[in-house]
Amino acid sequence: MKILLAYPTRSSFIARDIKILASKHVVSEHSYYSLAPADLLRGFLAVKSCDLLYLWFASIRALPLVLFARMLGKPVITVVGGYEAANCPEISYGNARKWQQRIPTRWILGLSQLILAVSRASSEAIIKNLKVAPQKVHLLYHGFEDFARDDNSVKVPVILTVGRADSSGWIRKGIREFFLAAEQMPEHSFVYVGGVDIDIPEILGRPMAPNITLVGAVPFETIGDYYGVAKVYLQASHHESFGCSVAEAMLYRCIPVVRDAYALPEVVGNTGVTFSGDSIAAVVQALTTALKMDAGEGERARLRVLNEFSYEKRKSDLLALIEKTRIA
């Protein structure tokens, strides 16, 4: 079968789905980010030549492709991310906050034959906030290959966070907590891996703590160098539909410290430390507890990802869902 996989940008988890689908089908790709006439035409031609449209994110930018696919009688499978179904006015986040934003998303999901959610938290948000029939929503966790199998790095008491530091993520992604916790824990090293698009000292109103190292963006192929040595991984997000970087860190035996928010507790389960509330004291206490845990906790975190969120599990289930949708 010919499958068109459409997305705004090609992230690592989208690349994994491309690899899975290409193992059994002919896969072509299209970025729907640009709505320029030439790009729209390329998208329409790609839809015309495919048998099924597999869409990552129910974005308004993808609506023309979905409408055209359904006009041609071709099935659509949509994977919903975090933003589309979120309704979080307290952090000014989510497509479901306003009816003007909800309508295009609901059109896309209404035209889709199958909707995939990457966590139970996401599934519940899709059903509740976007009024989607539960029978259309299928839970399919992200799947991770064991790329840390041969890692023998020696852990050091470093606290790591990975992600882009920008104005939209300062509160939502818990970047603020990373920098403020570092101020309260001067005896420990904090490492931030990812692009920095904001003036952090200006936001803080003071210089950055000297125990913080900003690495900058690194290729996915080398990020394991940082996961491998850090004992603790901090994800203080207020909203995550899953939290792929947390799972990747857990594969490298990092002990996860996460906020009790949306899908994060679902990912870490009973491993690591989960904190509640907005106080920096709670973050510091959670980090202190994690740093005192022995290496066995990191191994438990790794095994959780391998057992619950394996690449082979996602591959098997996704290919079966594709076949079921094709037959229907």
Pin down the residues of each PLM region:
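Donor nucleotide-sugar binding/catalytic pocket of nucleotide-sugar-dependent glycosyltransferases
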Residues: 110-149, 158-164
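Conserved donor-binding/catalytic core segment of Leloir-type glycosyltransferases
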Residues: 151-185, 191
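Conserved acidic donor-binding segment of nucleotide-sugar-dependent glycosyltransferases
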Residues: 272-280, 288-294
